[in-house]
Amino acid sequence: MLFRSAVANRAPPGLFGGLIADVPFVDVVNTMLDADLPLTPPEWLEWGNPITDPAVFESMRAYSPYDNVAPRSYPAILALGGLTDPRVTYWEPAKWVARLQSTMTGGGPVVLKTNMQAGHGGASGRFDRLAEVALEYGFALACATRGAALDTTAGTVQGKASS
């Protein structure tokens, strides 16, 4: 998810119709600077420690999606978070979406859905999980058919004239 979110900051406008960011790790710098988070110190072995190494800090800042949001057009983005996620805290996608919404100059929409009963793996229970999948598929379909009309009776997409 980190890679997809970082690409959204760098890709030419219009390259992607949409992006689904499912529990995205987007605030790399702040997370890796917080030694009180349970997964941060063990991750320093792989990522490096930005607290003690300025080069690691600068490297993380260079690719961290949250730190690289710029005034530009972004694709439609659906960010999903879980309130009880121990890996990607719920405020990461929330902060990222807020920054995108206040900074972007076009494109979108950029929306956030926080599941108040879920962790990193999403909803539990068959029907709750199916509802999450339906939301993601519906968003993807809406992005793919933007500018087109979906004929639900025939299951086909018809071109729609631009105005």
Regions picked out by a protein language model, each given a short descriptive name:
Residues 1-163:
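Active-site-proximal cap/loop segments of hydrolase catalytic domains
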